[in-house]
Amino acid sequence: MSHANIRPAEHLAYAQRERLAFIELRVYFCGNLTRAHIERRFGVKPAASARDLIAYRALAPHNLQYSAASRCYLPTKAFRPIFKH
């Protein structure tokens, strides 16, 4: 299935879709992402940022990898945006 045909997160609340789109943009353009980035940007608690990362990884399982050495998420070589930006 082509990523272009995926309509991600239609069942999620608007606020969570915005956070998931931020996850994608941040990791794609900045090259890394931590839960703290989500927490600072949106003013959410650590549990919410963890849920957002779980949700994004469920929608795009091949886009992010966790680097224990860097303690952050990095884009994979297979990264393909799922949100229309």
Question: What annotation goes with each model-predicted range?
Answer:
Residues 1-85:
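Short, basic/aromatic recognition patches that contact phosphate-bearing ligands
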